[in-house]
Amino acid sequence: MDRLKLPGMFAAGLLAWQAVALANSPARTEEFSGNNLRDIRLGMAANELAEAGYVDFACAADTKHALAGWKNWRDCPADASGTRAIRFGYDPSTSRDGTMVAGHPAILTLLIDDTGHVAGLQIETDPKARLYIRKKAFLLGLQAKSRYGSDGWACSEGRPGAGDQPVGGIYLKERCTKTISGRSLVVERNLFRRPDQDSKSFVDETRISILRAKN
């Protein structure tokens, strides 16, 4: 039976997943001193980044421009601030499930500044993930918010676009920001169906940006 054709059941399932995500996310204090992803931490030098455990290095601006490793970060084009964006994934030989963040297939981008230090990290749920996994993608944002402390977030809700419809009775366009321990965080969550999408197609995503906070 296709759940997407049963809005009530689908909505109940989404709410249940959301409750589980919140319940299983550990509480955090309003200071954060851990790594931001695995062994990656904002501010660390690029030459300190571990090569083992990571694969598929490429320039985010042109993913056909492959890199041998972190050490080749200067081969990618810099933006106006001198920051270079490196796409990467997890080595399947050490990460059996592939590039996953908190159980969600993810697209990862590391930002390195012109001094050779990690300036930021971007995490996006993978839109090519299988449907049964992808329809939980909006929950990753809840897990990210809990990781950095549930308090102190400033959130806003976007207005529906022309013809946009809820999915399973839920419409979500949320953007939340927070600054903590020298990190500027942005968590965006979307769940809706555009007018050009059929019953099995919809927007369901989380985008997370972790940058060094400006003084």
Where are these regions (language model features)?
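Mid-chain, structured segments of secreted extracytoplasmic proteins
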Residues: 71-121
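Generic hydrophobic-segment detector
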Residues: 2-3, 33, 106, 110, ...
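C-terminal segment of classical bacterial N-terminal signal peptides
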Residues: 15-23
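Bacterial N-terminal signal peptides that target proteins for export
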Residues: 1-12
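Non-cytosolic coordination micro-motifs
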Residues: 24-75, 114-215
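Positively charged, low-complexity intrinsically disordered regions
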Residues: 4, 19, 85-88
